[in-house]
Amino acid sequence: MAKPWLNGEHRQNRENDAIVFLILILLAFLPYVNALSNTFVYDDRQQILENPYVHSFRYLGRIFGSTVWTFEGAQGITNYYRPLMTFAYLLAYKIFGLLPFGFHLMNLVLHAAVVLLVFAVTERLFHDRLISLIASGLFALHPIHTESVAWIAGVTDLELSFFFLLSFLLYLHLADTGRKTTRSWTSYILLVLSYSLSLLSKEQALVLPALAIVYEHLYRPGEAGSQFHDKWRRYLPLCLVAAAYIAFRRFALGGFAPAIWRPTMSWSGVVLNAIALIGSYLGKLVWPVHLTAFYVFHESRSVADPRVLAGLAGLIVCAGLFAWLWRTARPFSFALLWMGATLAPVLNARWMPAQVFAERYLYLPSIGFCWLIGWVVAKLWRGAREGSRPAALAFLRQAIAITVAFVACFYAIRTVERNRDWRDEEVLYRKTLEAQPDAQVIHTNLGVDYSERGDWANAEREWILALGPGTPSAVTLSNLGLVRMKQKRYSEAADLFDQAIRLRPSFVDPYKHLAEMYVEMGRLVDADNQFQHAVSLAPLDINLRNTYGHFLLQQGRASDAREQFARSAEADANAEAYDNLGDLDLAAGDTQRARADYQAALALNEIDNHADFGLAKLDEQQGRIADAVREYRAGLETDPRNAVALAAVQRLTGQTSQ
């Protein structure tokens, strides 16, 4: 039977834990509250708004069995594998619909959960609550994490870090330093499941087995005499899961890197640029200013490059710090290994895409940095409590407390400010171009934002700037072709579309724009050919299917049009496809199917006046006058000047009054 004072002590500890967790949750949440009102930006629109995989559970097999962009068809064939990201979007869509708030809330909750796991892992590793609190608090507030939290697509790093930390914590449970751990199958199953989810978040998780092996043989205290088989049994599950994942990526998906983006870069160049990147990442961790969403990559070609020299200096400092910590405070040298191992996968510029350097790549590695800062601050604080000069020590403690508070406030303010940069696409792209004026992809994206608002002059300006030096992108060429098409400069437009196709034959936009241009020019056979090519490249593109369906209707090809609208609805249920199917069924006299089509459209869009008017026509044909009037009036709420509907209401109400 437990003694009362032990129960009281246990209750006090639980209350203290609750207070600590509440503080950490507030530190994680409060700086990001203003991000909840941000919109979809950058890749969010394609990966959420235009992605049928996100809108239906029937694509679950494709989510986990294919790469991220395969919903785009041939142009989306890559080895970029992030199934847990798409699955998270699917769950958020089912809960919140297409409200950006829900997706931002998901990121915020995940960030808070990661902060709590940082605290738990730190305490398990170093057995020091003060260090754990400082490290996790610093991690919660660090502005370098804004991209991962404020940008919805940053969820990949949040998921990776959550399951990576959880897996490491479960591994530490198997390798408990204070006692012999009871190894149950449940523990191993949880470890395998958690690590599998980490790998399904991002391949960066492959470094976890290496970290576990190093920790097991070099850092875990208390069992120096342990048998080798006792040690390897703890990390063997991680190694087996990693091997299975590598085999799956290699044989089912074709590898890890989607392409060698810089095939001309030599391996000596890879090393030089990796050193330069290390210097840049260390600089952003220590002094997180001039943050931006996109950094233009400038290749380093010489050891004398200032960025390489800065990286070498950083490596020398880290090596010296590691050697000193190994001798004086060995457990904390593991923090440097954590940073190096988790950052290593993003240091190969030869394989990295256009954005070689990105702040979000620091989300997981920064934990090691936070451990070191936590250790330094805790050591200074405790040192300021011992000595023979109380007044001086009190002053030192006050100075430490003020410094910590100042840094925390500075970080929180910088985070709040950075959240505003992600508010919407125009703000994001303008802010990014202020910092990186030669970012061609950002000029392209800003031009798209202008074009969607009908500002074609500014769109053209941005796309011309996006051409820049070197080989232009197929996207930019296609967009400029669209401008020339709208200016009726068809020959120039066709030339730009052809250039885009030669650069990227699987890119669907130039085929679609060529089809639309040929329609304007009256070259209907050529238009039909381009439409057919486009839908073969992007079979799940509902907008393309619907556009092609309308074209076929105008040519009197109702049967072919029906097929396009049906495939559109099948790919991703949408009101436009069902509206057109309803019109076709109504014209064919199939009133039952027409009614089902219009009702399906209204289920997807309750203010779809086209469906309301279609149902009204059906009711009128079937003599259900009161229902017809009600449907016409429902449609008039969103289309109050529709002459046909107004006349129908007047006519039908006149009939009922008679």
Indicate residue ranges for each PLM-predicted region.
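Structural marker of alpha-solenoid helical repeat scaffolds
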Residues: A435, P469, L503, L537, ...
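Register position in tetratricopeptide repeats
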Residues: E452, K486, E520-M521, Q554-Q555, ...
